[in-house]
């Protein structure tokens, strides 16, 4: 097969994958790229979450963990009710919600992995101050999972990696030479700044 024919096939395949992977984000209806199967990402997130639970020290503050779980359950119910009322498919169907409180006073953070795996660090509790503040932080993190931002980001990463490999092939390996000469993934770095994290 000649080079031109090969590039046509690759180009058509990439366009097909991109078009097939386009969908709309829940609530905002914003177009987003989703070429990574959500179930795969959820399974990977669940495995990583288990490792985090083994590695990190969990807080023994049962009252605070119960508060986190209570806030989470209320949000789960609100999300479900919203999508039922709106007659929209619930993007959290299939989520296996779980909540942990990690004992790290220096870490002022919380996050929600794909599939509803949520962690709150004890350090952020000084900032949130009360149930309302904690609910605001948790709501923000859960919104990322509802909007499927991780799936979109992983899909962009795959597409970017494929494009970078294609550019390297077309340039006769020049991109790899630049990376070796500079000791860094030049395109990866530039794309991280300009494409993956534009704001």
Identify the residue ranges that each predicted region occupies:
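A Zn2+-metalloprotease active-site environment signal
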Residues: 2-199
């Amino acid at each position: 097969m000649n080079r031109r024919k090969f590039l046509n096939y690759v180009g058509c395949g990439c366009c097909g994958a991109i078009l097939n992977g386009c969908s709309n984000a829940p609530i905002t209806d914003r177009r987003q790229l989703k070429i990574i199967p959500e179930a795969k990402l959820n399974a990977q997130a669940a495995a990583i979450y288990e490792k985090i639970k083994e590695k990190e020290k969990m807080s023994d503050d049962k009252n605070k963990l119960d508060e986190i779980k209570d806030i989470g359950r209320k949000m789960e119910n609100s999300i479900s009710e919203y999508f039922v009322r709106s007659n929209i498919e619930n993007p959290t169907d299939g989520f296996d919600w779980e909540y942990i409180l990690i004992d790290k006073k220096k870490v002022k953070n919380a996050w929600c992995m794909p599939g509803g795996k949520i962690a709150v660090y004890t350090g952020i509790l000084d900032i949130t101050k009360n149930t309302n503040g904690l609910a605001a932080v948790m709501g923000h993190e859960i919104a990322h999972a509802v909007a499927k931002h991780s799936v979109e980001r992983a899909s962009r990463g795959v597409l970017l990696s494929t494009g970078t490999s294609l550019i390297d092939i077309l340039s006769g390996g020049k991109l790899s030479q630049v990376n070796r000469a500079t000791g860094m993934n030049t395109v990866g770095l530039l794309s991280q700044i300009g494409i993956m994290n534009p704001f």
